[in-house]
Amino acid sequence: MFCFQCEQTAGCSGCTGAAGVCGKKSVTADLQDELTGALVGLAHACMNNPKTEQTDRIIIEGLFTTITNVNFNDETLREMIARVREEKGRVVPGCAACMSPCGNTSDYDMKRMWEADEDIRSLKSLILFGIRGMAAYAYHAMVLGYTCLLYTSDAADEED
């Protein structure tokens, strides 16, 4: 386990071992990394293939699920991983049957990020945590029925 995304981080350097200061277990941290890697794989799949109507929603929900202290339920994380992989199958049908894996839709191994040069790791972590933060706002907006920035403009004040 390696986690350093919250203010409770042990010694201001990250939690390691069997559990974090916040109570997150090592297995849960691994599942969050697996979910993040699956989300990266789905994003790669969408680079050259059209998304479905649900793709963005699943990505936002998946990112929100990995935010600190949002969800430490291992079964929920496993279900979200399965949903992300199922969505990838809809975006790129038949990819799993390909005899020549190209790597364009593979899940990303988060260990590569955590074991990268510290400057690269820091930059990628900053980007990831920022995207997760934006996903939190987007997730709550979706739950409330908002779908775009149009609602922040004067157009939202106009009556139909």
Map each language-model feature to its residues:
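Long, low-complexity or tandemly repetitive, helically biased scaffold regions used
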Residues: 93-115
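Cys/His-coordinated zinc-binding microdomains
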Residues: 7
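Short, non-ligating residues that shape and space the ligands of small metal-coordination modules
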Residues: 12-13
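Boundary segments of small protein-protein interaction reader/adaptor domains
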Residues: 123-131, 135-145
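Charged, amphipathic alpha-helical linkers/stalks
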Residues: 31-46
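Cys/His/Pro-rich metal-binding microdomains
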Residues: 4, 16
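Single conserved hydrophobic/aromatic residue that forms the stacking wall/gate
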Residues: 151-160
